[in-house]
């Protein structure tokens, strides 16, 4: 069934003097000035506003995914911001999905595990983004209670031409589904890739 079940909040900057700026240009500036948490707070609020507007227009995507910087994941402030924004705009926590990467866990696996458990208790969904690009992915799946597995686009770029990539992505999708996770394959851009995933990979969600 072809339908939109969710969206991802991505930030772009239309600068009045320099025109369109990609995140690769301006995010390092935020990071260098320790403002990534502030930017993330703004994105969370804007996402909730957009969800509220869609609800009023009877447009109902299942959820909106928001990328969370690694160092911010274990901050008490993040939970406060999420609860405040969802309450203010009347958004159910289950409509917010927090996307985290393996780098979020590198320095503090126990802290990340605790934080993710707390988010889940409050009703927020958590997704592991760019799965397969790190060396410890499987150990993270064992400890971190993520609900969604997002497979990195590098595994689908050469599918179906590459039999090796095809075998890998099929196995990873099967792994996620066997763990009762929703599986999303990122970077799907061609009809051939869509058909391959439907016919050979248990029909995961695509992005």
Annotated model-derived regions:
Residues 1, 16-18, 57, 118, ...:
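Flexible loop/coil segments at beta-strand boundaries within sensory signal-transduction domains
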Residues 22, 77-79, 111-112, 137, ...:
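Residues at alpha-helix caps and immediate loop-helix transition turns in enzyme cores, especially N-
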Residues 1-28, 47, 149:
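A short, well-structured catalytic beta-strand-centered motif of the EAL phosphodiesterase domain
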Residues 3-8, 35-111, 187:
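Catalytic core of bacterial c-di-GMP phosphodiesterases, primarily the EAL and HD-GYP domains
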Residues 24-28, 37, 117, 157:
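Conserved long alpha-helical elements within nucleotide-processing catalytic cores of c-di-GMP signaling
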Residues 30-34, 106, 158-164:
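Short, contiguous acidic/charged loop-to-helix segments that flank catalytic cores in large enzymes
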Residues 6, 83-159, 173-207:
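The catalytic core of metal-dependent phosphodiesterases that act on cyclic dinucleotides
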Residues 39-42, 165-171:
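Conserved acetyl-CoA-binding loop-helix of GNAT-fold acetyltransferases
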């Amino acid at each position: 069934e072809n339908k939109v079940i969710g969206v991802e909040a991505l930030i772009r900057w239309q600068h009045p003097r320099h025109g369109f700026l990609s995140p690769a240009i301006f995010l390092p500036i935020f990071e260098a000035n320790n403002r990534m948490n502030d930017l993330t707070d703004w994105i969370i609020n804007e996402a909730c506003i957009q969800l509220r507007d869609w609800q009023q227009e009877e447009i109902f995507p299942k959820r909106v995914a928001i990328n969370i910087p690694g160092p911010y994941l274990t901050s008490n402030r993040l939970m406060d911001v999420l609860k405040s924004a969802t309450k203010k705009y009347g958004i159910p926590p289950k409509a917010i999905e927090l996307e985290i990467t393996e780098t979020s866990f590198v320095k503090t696996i126990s802290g990340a595990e605790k934080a993710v458990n707390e988010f889940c208790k409050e009703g927020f969904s958590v997704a592991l983004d760019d799965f397969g690009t790190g060396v410890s992915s499987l150990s993270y799946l064992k400890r971190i209670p993520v609900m969604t597995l997002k497979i990195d686009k590098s595994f689908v770029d050469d599918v179906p031409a590459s039999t090796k990539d095809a075998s890998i992505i099929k196995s990873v999708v099967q792994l996620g589904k066997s763990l009762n996770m929703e599986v999303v394959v990122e970077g799907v851009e061609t009809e051939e890739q869509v058909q391959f995933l439907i016919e050979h990979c248990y029909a995961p969600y695509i992005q």
